[in-house]
UniProtKB/Swiss-Prot annotation:
Domain of life where this protein originates: Eukaryota
Matching HAMAP family: Ribosomal_uS7_B
Main location: plastid
Family membership noted in the UniProt record: Belongs to the universal ribosomal protein uS7 family.
A Gene Ontology cellular-component term: chloroplast
Free-text function comment from the UniProt entry: One of the primary rRNA binding proteins, it binds directly to 16S rRNA where it nucleates assembly of the head domain of the 30S subunit.
Protein name, entry field: Small ribosomal subunit protein uS7c
Alphabetical GO biological process terms: translation
């Protein structure tokens, strides 16, 4: 057994303009090739576009979108006796938010449009309204978990 001390849990930092942890999580997921300033530009442009489209607080739209896409349950492949079962498992809040952000960014990357800021803002507004690809992905995951409910005891 290791004699080292346990590592302290890191708290999520918040972004410089909005002082919001969700925005920072979004920036870190959109980041490519270490270009963080570009990631910040994309996010802030998307937030401005949301402000123009909805004429409400863009951070509340972001929170609502992430809350709408966050899954409560997911399936995990588990090998039992030579066959692989999709076992439904509950998801914690942090992991759920991370999944929601990943799905939102994936859906916005697939969208047709001019640039990433435009696509991301459109996806966030749609998700806040309860439509869009990311919401569909969440519903699909929940259906999969419900269909494989019989394997819940394999946890």
């Amino acid at each position: 057994m290791s004699r080292r001390g346990t590592a302290e849990e890191k708290t999520a930092k918040s972004d410089p303009i909005y002082r919001n942890r969700l925005v920072n999580m979004l920036v870190n997921r959109i980041l490519k090739h270490g270009k963080k300033s570009l990631a910040y530009q994309i996010i802030y442009r998307a937030v401005k576009k949301i402000q123009q489209k909805t004429e409400t607080n863009p951070l509340s739209v972001l929170r609502q979108a992430i809350r709408g896409v966050t899954p409560d349950i997911a399936v995990k492949a588990r090998r039992v006796g030579g066959s692989t079962h999709q076992v439904p498992i509950e998801i914690g809040s942090t992991q759920g938010k991370a999944l929601a952000i990943r799905w939102l960014l994936g859906a916005s990357r697939k969208r047709p449009g001019r640039n990433m800021a435009f696509k991301l803002s459109s996806e966030l507004v749609d998700a806040a309204k309860g439509s869009g690809d990311a919401i569909r992905k969440k519903e699909e995951t929940h259906k999969m978990a419900e269909a494989n409910r019989a394997f819940a005891h394999f946890r």
